[in-house]
Amino acid sequence: MPTEANTYDPQRIESTAQHYWDSTHAFEVNEHSNKPKYYCLSMLPYPSGALHMGHVRNYTIGDVISRYKRMTGHNVLQPMGWDAFGLPAENAAIKNKVAPAQWTYKNIERMRTQLKSLGYAINWSREFATCQPDYYVHEQHMFTRLMRKGLAYRRNALVNWDPVDQTVLANEQVIDGRGWRSGAPVEKREIPQWFLRITDYAQELLDGLNTLDDWPEPVKTMQRNWIGRSEGLEIRFEVRDVDNNALEALRVFTTRPDTLFGVTFVSIAPEHPLALHAAKSNPGLAGLLTQMKQGGLSEAELKTQEKRGMDTGLKAIHPITNEQLPVWVANFVLMAYGTGAVMAVPGHDQRDQEFANKYGLPIRQVIALKEPKNQDESTWEPDVWRDWYADKTREFELINSAEFDGLDYQGAFEVLAERFERQGRGQRRVNYRLRDWGVSRQRYWGCPIPVIYCPTCGAVPVPENQLPVILPENVAFSGTGSPIKTDPEWRKTTCPECGGPAERETDTFDTFMESSWYYARYTSPNAREMLDKRANYWLPVDQYIGGIEHAILHLMYFRFYHKLMRDARLVDSDEPAINLLTQGMVIAETFYRKNPDGSKDWINPADVNVECDERGRITGATLISDGQPVLIGATEKMSKSKNNGVDPQIMVTKYGADTVRLFSMFAAPPEQSLEWNETGVEGMARFLRRLWTQVHHHASHGPATALDITALDTAQKAIRCKTHNTIARVEDDYGRRRSFNTAIAAVMELSNTLARFDDTTTQSHAVRQEALETMVLLLNPITPHTSHALWQTLGHPETLLEDLPFPKVDTTALVRETAILAVQINGKLRGTIEVATDAPREHIENNALTEPNTARFLEGLTVLKIIIVPGKIVNIVAR
């Protein structure tokens, strides 16, 4: 009859292990170790109030790596903190009528408890929240330093403005051109904002990607494209008004000066000074510019919006032909990119062509294939030239370009560059798509920007001895503006330079500021300065883990801020992380019912009964509450919008933390999407119960004697061989391949093999002991609670398994004295034989021919020849 001790009870097992880890401060580390350091970090969470399965997968991956590295002799740091500022707290404050700070700290308490219930090997003594003044004071100090160096500056920039709520909206708060809360049409408004000169580091950020050998190529490609280095010419176009008066010249950057003779108009942004000048005398244009101020600023909206424009009446003078080209305002030209002006070549640019077709503007072909394959390719048409451009192997030449006809791209580039530079009409330029980082946010729940505005002295950085500028937390928050803007006691101050009356900046930092350097603060969380010498012990991060959706913004700013800290002599390294792992999404089935208006009510999978075919595919579904059918949607990323999330806490309560951890590592490789499947979770629970039973059954037969590897029989040697083969596979899977699913599969194979092993002798018992100890240690990084308990069941004192060495391969155990060969007749498997690895051919042939099942199939046949693949197959050819 099973006793409490030998029954697999996850809650009891996990509580015991976690108490031991907490009481012994098992995962607190310092820099005074003779072991090599290893810093493993998963991206810090936003304290939304509840962990989701994406969190569980992310942090379990990090925990597996951390525990494995500690077992391989490393001094491992795995910290945790909270990315605590941000818009969701403001939205929750409006909805729940609580201060953002109160909501945030309550959520942190809940999520910390959830993380601890999963048994992560986190050094909690280094924990912080980015909304704490003793964290953001250093961020403010860094900003004032950047101001003095000229790397932080203020200029006007466009924002999304809600005229009803009187507030700035983030791009994601603009829905179909309207404010998410008020429903009012959103306006584009220019207001002063603070920027960091990330463009000063553009080339270094680009070059640094070549040193990141252990970052995924897709991430590096996305960053290269975002930085967007391009070489071209900046060309000067003289401009004249309707009365032929000269105006300020237009500067246009182009990577394709070879298309210059194809320019039929020039496009400028609605905010361009020339557009504003022309609108003064053109009411129709002024009205259009006002309309263009409405709508969001996101790239997605700008790409999908209808292309609109108007002729300003101004003329740009072609720098070679002197042709007067109309200057058009176009809503797809952005003032923030390049010079806010584009030379339009509708003959060889799809966007320009769509605009030209809409407004009846000329289209000219100025590039042709040197060697067209057929008549169709000789005839210029939009679809044809798009095909040309797609085929990078084809050669082109200029046509309809006066004396430049016949030149290829490079030839035309060099000739035109030399000509324009000589005439003072242009110059070679390297341009970057990357723009300076706008760090101002017109929101309350963020780090205050440490600047004072004085009528006499202008913008003055807050002196170091007056930092931090603390954000008041006990405020009434309505959502119609920031409380600190209307708090005169907080806002009004004195100028640190002249002593006169002044006001504080009421904008707060973009929350990417906090998440751009948090990893460094973990290394010295109690330092008086931003960082101390401990930072150079731990940095760079050895393993960073997070979703690929962070490839552009967070990971770019993460790299940029590290270089700022390096240049401030706070860190020695050039890059913040050596290895980056981007885990896949957690996806799940979706279910819904249609409403009369065509909308969908999404139903959580936990509320649905499903029917499956023999392959496990869902064929039908009904709602548990009423038994009526529901529709089956696609398998999609777990999200609130599709109501297909699974609460990790429910799973931990039902199955135990180790089962949840085991499934999240077994269901898919880390970089691939993981499809949540509770049937799979149940399978992992069965495996852990089976392992628990295996160990307890073995232990019930008493302690094992010492293993004598010189006195083993064939079966015992086979088990040892399987055990040490498993060690080799799992070590490679954990260490080099990061393939945790195959590591688990290897241990499962060993468990199944061991279940068929008959250990009636003391040596067999010792062989089984070694195999079980090996399985417990191999699984420890993934199922640490279960391993903690089973290690004691196997006769060892309670200890921290991470301080035990990871199992080592005994290469002598891998040498097999016998081999099992498949026996085939005419290519079909008919039996197996076991022979000595050095058996002569005649012995192998005789054993194969006399194997009972093989002999039965050979009756009445004549053996023509026997083919032996050493160590694998015996194929008998007969007829």
Swiss-Prot record:
Similarity section: Belongs to the class-I aminoacyl-tRNA synthetase family.
Record localization: Cytoplasm
HAMAP family linked to this entry: Leu_tRNA_synth_B
NCBIfam families, alphabetized: leuS_bact (TIGR00396)
Motif ('KMSKS' region): 637-641
A Gene Ontology molecular function term of the record: leucine-tRNA ligase activity
Protein name as annotated: Leucine--tRNA ligase
Substrates-to-products reaction catalysed: tRNA(Leu) + L-leucine + ATP = L-leucyl-tRNA(Leu) + AMP + diphosphate
Species whose genome carries this gene: Xylella fastidiosa (strain Temecula1 / ATCC 700964)
Cellular component terms per the entry's GO annotation: cytosol
Motif 'HIGH' region, chain ranges: 45-55
PROSITE patterns reported in the protein's UniProt record: AA_TRNA_LIGASE_I
Pfam families: Anticodon_1, tRNA-synt_1, tRNA-synt_1_2, tRNA-synt_1g
Positions of ATP binding: K640
Enzyme Commission code(s) on record: 6.1.1.4
Keyword field: Aminoacyl-tRNA synthetase, ATP-binding, Cytoplasm, Ligase, Nucleotide-binding, Protein biosynthesis
Gene Ontology annotations of biological process type: leucyl-tRNA aminoacylation
Domain of life according to the entry: Bacteria
